[in-house]
Every structure is written in C-alpha cells, then in structure tokens.
Amino acid sequence: MSITAEEKARLIKEYATKEGDTGSPEVQIAILSSRIATLTEHFKSHKKDNHSRRGLLMMVAQRRKLLDYVKGKDEARYQKLISSLGLRR
C-alpha cells in the first residue's frame, strides 16, 4: 500500500525546485498523489477497508490544502503542477 523508496526518490527528483528539496509543496503533492493512486487500487479489491479509507480521505484533504496554498502563491506554478500530475482541476 505504500510507495517504494525508488518511486519516492523519482518523484522528489522530478518535482524538486532545487537540489535536495524534499519539502516543497510540489514534491509533497506528487508523493501524496502517488499514495492516493495506490490506495485507490487497493479499494478495488478491498471495498470494506474503512480504516484505510479514512487515511485516504485525510491524504486527499492534505493534498487539497497544499494545492490551495500553491494556487494562492503562484497560479502558473499551480496550473503546471496539476497538468503534469493529471489532476482534474
């Protein structure tokens, strides 16, 4: 249910704004999106797993907050991020 260290390192490298950047909103949103996609696949075969569903909803809320933050800071950065991640907004 979690992402591998290699996948996480790839996401950090792809979305980092500078070398060694692991905490920028872009990196956090990319990692959360990957975890959300993994959990969504999990729910296709485990429909009654409500404990994990709560975790999924918390991750979605956290990603929404981070996306709102980026949108408030820089609209162009926000548009670039959601298009590269394939999010719907």
UniProtKB/Swiss-Prot annotation:
It comes from the Bacteria. Keywords: Ribonucleoprotein, Ribosomal protein, RNA-binding, rRNA-binding. It holds the Pfam family Ribosomal_S15. GO terms for molecular function: rRNA binding; structural constituent of ribosome. Signal peptide: none annotated. GO terms for biological process: translation. One of its GO terms (cellular component) is cytosolic small ribosomal subunit. NCBIfam families: S15_bact. One of the primary rRNA binding proteins, it binds directly to 16S rRNA where it helps nucleate assembly of the platform of the 30S subunit by binding and bridging several RNA helices of the 16S rRNA. Belongs to the universal ribosomal protein uS15 family. Part of the 30S ribosomal subunit. Forms a bridge to the 50S subunit in the 70S ribosome, contacting the 23S rRNA. This is Small ribosomal subunit protein uS15. It comes from Dinoroseobacter shibae (strain DSM 16493 / NCIMB 14021 / DFL 12). The lineage of its organism: Bacteria, Pseudomonadati, Pseudomonadota, Alphaproteobacteria, Rhodobacterales.
